[in-house]
Amino acid sequence: MAAGVIRPLCDFQLPLLRHHPFLPSDPEPPETSEEEEEEEEEEEEEEGEGEGLGGCGRILPSSGRAEATEEAAPEGPGSPETPLQLLRFSELISDDIRRYFGRKDKGQDPDACDVYADSRPPRSTARELYYADLVRLARGGSLEDEDTPEPRVPQGQVCRPGLSGDRAQPLGPLAELFDYGLQQYWGSRAAAGWSLTLERKYGHITPMAQRKLPPSFWKEPTPSPLGLLHPGTPDFSDLLASWSTEACPELPGRGTPALEGARPAEA
């Protein structure tokens, strides 16, 4: 009987009771008397008056409090003191560099060695020489003064005057060809004897601009399908024949001897 009457509570499906916390979530402020509220209001008014006096001190620079607040204020990147500090720092760095790496006298440092003692200052800079040449050419003159004498050099080593006009620059045996090809631009500076010497030596040579070159001179070697150049030797027999038929004594042989020497090479 008792076992059939007694059943667990979960079978009755009773509503669960909610347990409230002991402490409220929003505690109410403690009740204060009117005297305490008046004291708090007076303290707040005094603090506001103190802040107002501090602001006036910042506005009036004559007061001591204003100076104290200005000194206590942090200096930002936009303050006027920042450039002055950077300038002082750069001056200190430059002084240190001059002290350790600059020129020193024997009195300051007995072991000092002047590395600039053997150097010679240049007479004129490259820019000055460049502009001087441009001005001289614009006025219709030559790159050299007319009174400049021809340089005396040993035989076989011809010197051509430089653009700056300060000294002659040796160019080797090819300088004669340059002098012969550019003598028309020298003007009255070229000596008559020197021009005649060049004319006798190189006047019989036909310039490349006046020669009739064969097609092989303008034909480039064609690459093979693999991207490599043809291993065979290019055929310049027509070029050699055209040069040998001309009356050019600079070649060792003329006409038939040159062709005969070229045919065995082809074979």
Swiss-Prot record:
GO biological process: digestive tract morphogenesis; enteroendocrine cell differentiation
Stretches with biased composition (Acidic residues): 28-50
Gene coding for it: PERCC1
Organism this protein belongs to: Homo sapiens (Human)
Bias (Low complexity): 74-83
Record keywords, A-Z: Developmental protein
Domain of life: Eukaryota
Transmembrane regions: none
Protein name, UniProt field: Protein PERCC1
Pfam families linked to this entry: TEADIR3
Keyword Zinc-finger: no
Alphabetized InterPro entries for the sequence: TEADIR3_omega_loop
Disorder named in the UniProt entry: Diarrhea 11, malabsorptive, congenital: A disease characterized by severe, life-threatening watery diarrhea associated with generalized malabsorption and a paucity of enteroendocrine cells. DIAR11 is characterized by onset of intractable diarrhea within the first few weeks of life.
UniProt function note: Plays a critical role in intestinal function. Acts by promoting the development of enteroendocrine cells (EECs) of the gastrointestinal tract and pancreas. It is thereby required for normal enteroendocrine peptide hormone secretion.
Stretches for region Disordered: 19-88, 142-163, 247-267
